[in-house]
Structures are given as structure tokens and as C-alpha cells.
A protein has these predicted regions:
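N-terminal secretory signal peptides that target proteins for export/translocation
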Residues: 1-6
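Bacterial N-terminal signal peptides
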Residues: 10-21
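Mature catalytic domains of secreted/periplasmic carbohydrate-active enzymes
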Residues: 26-495
Length: 495
């Protein structure tokens, strides 16, 4: 993932890309108009049309259906950076960014790979953990910014088979195990930054080692990055291609990568390829947006502690309650929650991460129907007692879920602007009935007793008609450029 300083540069670049006169699409048949999303223009400059694919809206919706319904994914940051584990020359220095932030010479960093043994790596156990946690898809760093691939690449010997103590492909067995459990599989690939392979980008940073000054970026693009992406697609047939960092990715450089994606009809990509390509879903890093937005799907990627890669001194674990509420919050904003773990160099997921994932899984076993295959966005602003999601059914019927974070002292919760009487209401935990009345302000739900769940209690209501919220504020529209920060005034933590 990307550091604060690089991130700011990246988004400034994204705005400037609006001047480029390139549209990534062939002329479609008249019966199949393309889906077009316009990147925002810099002041006084024309916008760049960024065509996702030659497909109708219905076709795009069908391709993204599983992703929109999944709601919960597992991110895995694993690589050579797990060996120094956040420490270089006796000083705490980042995690997955340690080579860059510590200015570690290429030869010294390469030497770490011999200790990257994956000796305790159990892909079946990882997949089982994901399934038990209620995860629906898994994304792993096939290549992070250090250029090291977790599989045997024919285009660089800087990989798990040829350069590391693991001496084997680490991607294939995980892909197989994940799919055996019925989950989707995705690969993360750092297309522009590569601190080891010749010619790879260094982000905003100047080369810190003479070995990095050899080669040029376009040659790297053509001889390493593009062939490796083709390898990933051919070897593992991922369901998601998760790009990261857009530095130096002009439209001309992005076009060949875009063509590879389009050649795989099922493939979904995020918003970080660059060159004006908006992607199928927008990516928010370490930040939950203020509201849902109309337009592209949303994925919020976040850590369980404060780092993505393994860092031995990072013990600032988020509570399971916070993580469950994050899932509730993001789903209520019509997004997916991609939650990260950082295994050790031996391939061990830290126990605090396991414990928290399993806690989420236990909550989902009771309340999962309020998360999976639901939609969010009923309210632009969060409600003071919690969040809402809903499902529409045949014949106009609707199921409404109240995610109750703050259990009411008087037993009453107002659903503002909703003046329809439900056919039924109950708590998901225990099935206790919930009564409702209609007031001038909206629907009031009355609960008995105490909260059935200290983290998030969920009530479900069945309606025979579509929901109508009076005095509702329209959702903002997603017109952001590829990878745009949802709140540009705030920079994310180093990543």
C-alpha cells in the first residue's frame, strides 16, 4: 500500500490526467452502449472519458453482483518485509514500506528473502479461517512495492521460488483452498512501484541505491509489470485484480493493462490502475466515507492494527466491537469491508487477528442476513442509534434491518421519515418480537429488555411495499477520479 506523501502526489496526478484525450473503449454495437464514467476535470480542462468495458449497464450489474453481495473480504499483506518485521538497524521503521522508509540497500533487502521461509504456512487453515469469519473473498499481495512475487515468475527471479527460503509457489495453494471453501479469490499487484527490479518506480522517492538507477520505467512496464500481470491472470484466473499506486501511469502506459483486464469477462478491478481508468469499484483506504454514493461500488480497506504487513511491535489491536461496527457502517453505506491481516515470515497469522476474525464470524452467524446481499444508503447521514440496510424482494416487498449500536434506555428507536407499518418485526438474536407505531416523525420501534448483543443488535422488519422515506436527502454521486480520497483534506496513515 502507499505512504502519505506518495498518496498526495498520486491524487494530484490523477486530476491532471483529465487533460489526456484517450478513451479506453472500442466502438460498441448500437445495441450495446458502453457504460461511461467521466473522470473529473482539472479547472478549465476537459474531462477524460473512462470507459469500463464494452457492456450494457445490465451486463455490468451482473458481473458485479457477487461483489456487491459479498460485503466482507480478507486482505493479506505477506512478503519479504515480514522478515525485518518493522525494525531496521535497531530502529522501528514501517512494515511493508520498510525498504523505502529505511532506505535499505537492494542487496541487504534481498538477503532478507532467505529468512522468508513460510515454514508454517497452511493455506487450508487460512481459507478455513476466512470461511469461519464469514469472509466471502480473499485478496493477497501477489507483488507489493518491493517487487517480490509470491509465485514463480518467468520475468524476474526475485520471487518466492527462486529467491526465498520458501522455495515454492505460495499463491496457487491458497487460491485452490479459498475456492474449495466457495470463496472468491483476488490478487493484489503493484504495477508502478517496484523498488528492486530494474526500472521500477520508486513512488515520490528518489532512488536510494545505485542499483536502482539502472533501467528505465517504460522498459520495466513492458518487460516485467505487464508480463507478470498476464502471468497472474493465466496462472490463477483471479476474480479481482487489485492495483495499487498510480505513479507515472499515463493513459498510454495503462492501456495494455486495461486490455488484459477486458480480455477476461468476469474480472473485476479496483480504482488504482491510473491513466484515467476508474475501475469497477472505488477504493477508500483506512477511512469509512461519510455517506453512501450513487455510482460505482465501494470497498473500504482497513487494518486490524496500525500496519498492513507484519510488524512485531505493533500491538495496537482494534477491538472486535469496533471491527463489527465498521462492517455494519460500511455495509450501511453500500460498501464492502476488506479487512487486512499480516502474517509472519513463517506464514503464521497473529493470534489477535485470528481471534478478532472469529468474533466477527460468530456475529455474522446470527446477523449475517443484515449484511450479505443487502443495500445501504437509505440515509445520507448516520443515525444516532446505529445504521440501516435493506433488501428488496419480488412483488415490491422490502426487508429492513436496523443495526442498533446504542440500545435505547427507554426501549424506543425512531426510524425517521418512514411512515409505513411493517407486517412483522423481530430481533435476529432470539427472535423476540418488536412492536411498531407510526408518528409524525416516522416509525417508532419498541424493544423489550436489554440488548441481545453488546456489539451490534439487529432488528428485522418485513414490509409488503417498497420503502418510502419522507424528507430524505439525495445521495451524492460518485464522480471521483481513480482512487480519489473521499476527504482530500485528510491524508491517510502511512501504508
Amino acid at each position: 500500500m502507499n505512504s502519505t506523501s506518495f498518496r498526495s502526489c498520486c491524487f494530484a496526478t490523477a486530476s491532471l490526467l483529465a487533460v489526456l484525450p484517450v478513451a479506453f473503449a472500442e466502438t460498441p454495437p448500437a445495441s450495446q452502449p458502453p457504460v461511461i464514467r467521466m473522470a473529473p476535470a482539472a479547472a478549465g480542462l476537459p474531462a477524460l472519458p473512462a470507459v469500463l468495458r464494452n457492456e450494457t449497464q445490465d451486463q455490468q450489474d451482473a458481473r458485479l453482483q457477487w461483489f456487491r453481495e459479498a460485503r466482507f473480504g480478507l486482505f493479506i499483506h505477506w512478503g519479504v518485509y515480514a522478515v525485518p518485521a518493522g525494525s531496521w538497524q535497531g530502529k522501528p521503521t514501517g512494515a511493508e514500506w520498510i525498504m523505502n522508509q529505511g532506505k535499505i540497500p537492494v542487496a541487504d533487502y534481498r538477503a532478507f528473502a532467505r529468512q522468508f521461509t513460510a515454514a508454517k504456512y497452511d493455506p487450508e487453515a487460512w481459507a478455513q479461517l476466512a470461511a469461519d469469519a464469514g469472509i466471502k473473498y480473499v485478496v493477497i499481495t501477489a507483488k507489493h512495492h518491493d517487487g517480490f512475487t509470491l509465485y514463480d515468475s518467468a520475468f524476474s527471479d526475485w520471487n518466492a521460488v527462486k529467491a526465498s527460503g520458501a522455495q515454492r509457489d505460495l499463491i496457487k495453494p491458497l487460491a485452490e483452498a479459498v475456492r474449495k471453501h466457495g470463496l472468491k479469490f483476488g490478487t493484489y499487484y503493484s504495477q508502478s512501484q517496484d523498488w528492486v527490479n530494474l526500472g521500477g518506480g520508486k513512488g515520490k522517492t528518489e532512488p536510494w541505491d545505485e542499483a536502482q538507477k539502472k533501467g528505465d520505467f517504460d522498459t520495466y512496464m513492458k518487460t516485467i509489470a505487464l508480463p507478470q500481470v498476464r502471468e497472474l491472470l493465466d496462472k490463477f484466473n483471479p476474480d479481482i485484480l487489485w492495483w495499487d499506486t498510480e505513479y507515472q501511469m499515463t493513459s498510454e502506459r495503462a492501456r495494455p493493462f486495461f486490455d488484459l483486464v477486458v480480455a477476461h469477462p468476469h474480472l473485476i478491478q479496483n480504482s488504482r490502475l491510473g491513466g484515467g481508468v476508474l475501475g469497477d469499484f472505488r477504493t477508500s483506504e483506512q477511512r469509512i466515507p461519510a455517506s453512501a454514493m450513487q455510482g460505482r461500488a465501494l470497498e473500504v480497506n482497513m487494518t486490524i492494527n496500525n500496519s498492513w504487513g507484519y510488524r512485531s511491535d505493533n500491538l495496537n489491536w482494534k477491538s472486535s466491537q469496533q471491527l463489527i461496527r465498521n462492517l455494519s457502517d460500511i455495509t450501511s453505506k453500500d460498501g464492502n469491508y476488506l479487512l487486512n491481516v499480516g502474517p509472519t515470515a513463517e506464514g503464521v497469522i497473529p493470534q489477535p487477528e485470528i481471534d478478532r476474525l472469529l468474533a466477527i464470524g460468530r456475529w455474522l452467524k446470527v446477523n449475517g442476513e443484515a449484511i450479505y446481499a443487502t443495500r445501504g444508503g437509505l440515509y445520507v447521514q448516520p443515525l444516532n442509534w446505529g445504521r440501516t440496510t435493506y433488501k428488496t424482494r419480488a412483488g415490491g416487498k422490502t426487508t429492513l434491518y436496523l443495526h442498533i449500536w446504542e440500545w435505547p434506555a427507554d426501549g424506543k428507536i425512531l426510524v425517521p421519515g418512514l411512515k409505513q407499518t411493517p407486517r412483522s418485526g423481530r430481533l435476529l438474536a432470539g427472535g423476540v418480537p418488536v412492536t411498531t407505531t407510526i408518528t409524525d416523525s416516522g416509525l417508532v420501534a419498541t424493544f423489550r429488555g436489554t440488548a441481545p448483543d453488546p456489539d451490534v443488535s439487529v432488528a428485522v422488519f418485513e414490509f409488503d411495499t417498497p420503502l418510502e422515506i419522507t424528507n430524505a436527502t439525495a445521495l451524492p454521486t460518485d464522480t471521483g477520479a481513480s482512487g480519489t480520497l473521499l476527504d482530500p483534506s485528510k491524508s491517510p496513515p502511512a501504508h
